[in-house]
Amino acid sequence: MAEFLDDQETRLCDNCKKEIPVFNFTIHEIHCQRNIGMCPTCKEPFPKSDMETHMAAEHCQVTCKCNKKLEKRLLKKHEETECPLRLAVCQHCDLELSILKLKEHEDYCGARTELCGNCGRNVLVKDLKTHPEVCGREGEEKRNEVAIPPNAYDESWGQDGIWIASQLLRQIEALDPPMRLPRRPLRAFESDVFHNRTTNQRNITAQVSIQNNLFEEQERQERNRGQQPPKEGGEESANLDFMLALSLQNEGQASSVAEQDFWRAVCEADQSHGGPRSLSDIKGAADEIMLPCEFCEELYPEELLIDHQTSCNPSRALPSLNTGSSSPRGVEEPDVIFQNFLQQAASNQLDSLMGLSNSHPVEESIIIPCEFCGVQLEEEVLFHHQDQCDQRPATATNHVTEGIPRLDSQPQETSPELPRRRVRHQGDLSSGYLDDTKQETANGPTSCLPPSRPINNMTATYNQLSRSTSGPRPGCQPSSPCVPKLSNSDSQDIQGRNRDSQNGAIAPGHVSVIRPPQNLYPENIVPSFSPGPSGRYGASGRSEGGRNSRVTPAAANYRSRTAKAKPSKQQGAGDAEEEEEE
């Protein structure tokens, strides 16, 4: 029976997509098409009566706690494997956290330390699982690590310290004093090159210890040279090692001894390891492009040529000689200026070479030459150096004050109306008249005549004043003669006295007395204000006529003589106005 069932043939149902036996296929097909339907979403057969329940239970959209929308039948799998907010356990402290915060927590939690009970060392929590494998072995390794023998140390230093020696060689190559400067100026610069060394660093005991260390260094290098196999360029590296050790040992040495030992060692090293070899041969050993300096004609690498020419240029080193500007501190000799320049260059470069300065390496800062003396300085120090540089020219004067003209240099402008006013106001007192009056009052005391003194001398005084004011005076414009205005009684007395003087001579006992200037007013003064209405003139004329009617005949005669003299004055004033208008 089982064999019969296995050997029977099957057919695929078009509705439910299942294999149906052939002998039962017809009945299944009729039942399947009537009662069973295919789910359009999951392509699974379900009874048509349960299709709505299946769609609501399996294929409806739900939202996860991570705000992701998906079908309900996939929610469980998403929460277990894909949701970022699912809970996970920390591998160090067994604390449940979300996946988003788990990594940050594990990094912090694993960085804690716990004391190991076996070796007594503090071990990181994240290394506790692997620590038992290495527990107790680290102490044995440290005990096995003995101090490095001097030979091994020298070998490692000789291989790894070539870079340091090359840096020292570059500084020596960039240094001009070993090749160009004589030894005498360098020795003259002892006090300035090492000016920052204290007296405690210049004692004799330091020199002895440094020399002993130097000899030990030489013996050790000779020992290493004999033990190491000969290789190409060995002598060069040994020479560089010797120079580096020498520069390091010279720190804190006295200025004169350090300078002499340094240059002597450099010369001896060149003679012993290369014979007549010079620094130019060392420069060419690196197969670099060498170009000559246009000032000193020495060969320098291409990348160092610009910096060297900037410092080697005599026009930059001696700016005061080229521009002709005078320094406010006095004009110095060219030799003195050049020596100052060499002194600054030697002090800056020797300090960096001998290790006496705590400045940073050249590679870490920008080196810019001073625009006055040409000395190369760091960018941070350049501003302060140029402010106090000896070669700095005099500060220019303020041009603002120069542009303002002086008051005394401006031409005095005179109004064109002034001469015309002077001509019109013929009654104005001239400056000459006032000066004469002041001089006469200063020469003799002025006092009023007493009542008992006869007024016989008034005529002489009046004539003298009229003569002094009528004459031309240099530097002053001519003014019309001023006639003193007297009262009626005085005029009568004067007229009577003149008549008496014609008949007889003046009494010798009388002295001419000048009245004060306040009592002498010109009679023909013209007011500067505009005249009033005609009515006022009419009234004044009537009143004046009334007053004139009461004047005595003597006073009238005196005024008539004065009126006769006025037309000539007015005629002269009119001529002056015509000349000014032309």
Curated annotation (Swiss-Prot):
GO terms for molecular function: zinc ion binding. A zinc finger (TRAF-type) spans 27-103. Residues 454-471, 486-495 have a biased composition (Polar residues). Residues 217-236, 401-582 are annotated as: Disordered. Keywords: Acetylation, Metal-binding, Phosphoprotein, Zinc, Zinc-finger. It comes from the Eukaryota. The modification Phosphoserine is found at S191, S278, S320, S326, S327, S409, S415, S430, S470. One of its GO terms (biological process) is negative regulation of innate immune response. The modification N-acetylalanine is found at A2. Interacts with MAVS, TICAM1, TRAF1, TRAF2, TRAF3. Interacts with TRAF6. Negative feedback regulator that controls excessive innate immune responses. Regulates both Toll-like receptor 4 (TLR4) and DDX58/RIG1-like helicases (RLH) pathways. May inhibit the LTR pathway by direct interaction with TRAF6 and attenuation of NF-kappa-B activation. May negatively regulate the RLH pathway downstream from MAVS and upstream of NF-kappa-B and IRF3. This is TRAF-type zinc finger domain-containing protein 1.
